[in-house]
Amino acid sequence: MGLLAGYFGGKTDALISYLITTRLAMPVVMVALASASLIGGSLKVVIILLGCLLWDRFAVVVRAAVQQIRDAEYVASAQALGCSTLRILASEILPNLVGALIVVATLEMAHAILLESALSFLGVGVQPPIPSWGLMIAEGKPYMFFSPWVIAIPGVALMVLVLGINLVGDGLRDLILPDGRN
């Protein structure tokens, strides 16, 4: 969606930007919590919810990157050669977005892990046969005062994983997109 909005501009950009802004206005945790409690919690439901709720940041980044790239000389030369719009998008613009998409994907991965853990902690995420750190923390609540390691170990593991993914994302951003360096 961001690819189309950034390339075509005009009414297409306005419509897609409106959809993105509408989606960004909804609180992710509340929508996921309401949807998961209505549909029921399972691994398949959580994966579909994460996909439906976390696409917007990809679209925003792609739209902004395409708006910068669409006026480049190599895109204009492809248009002058008579290449179709689909070919220009697929062979000229999309390969130049891979770096930005990798960075957003690593940072959104941490967001998805935290959202899944929150849903599982609240009881509407994945169900007990499937391991989840949120579920482990929820099941350890009764033992919090007598055996604090039951919730501390999955909590610390979750924190280390999310921190590690964020650090990798920051490192990739500095490596792939040098424009944003301080």
What positions do the PLM features span?
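Generic hydrophobic transmembrane alpha-helix motif, especially the helices
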Residues: 1-59, 64-68, 102
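A residue-level signal for alpha-helical anchor/packing sites in multi-pass solute transporters
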Residues: 3-4, 34, 47, 51, ...
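Amphipathic cytosolic juxtamembrane alpha-helices at the membrane-cytosol interface
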Residues: 9-17, 67-71, 76-103
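Short cytosolic juxtamembrane segments of multi-pass membrane proteins
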Residues: 167-182
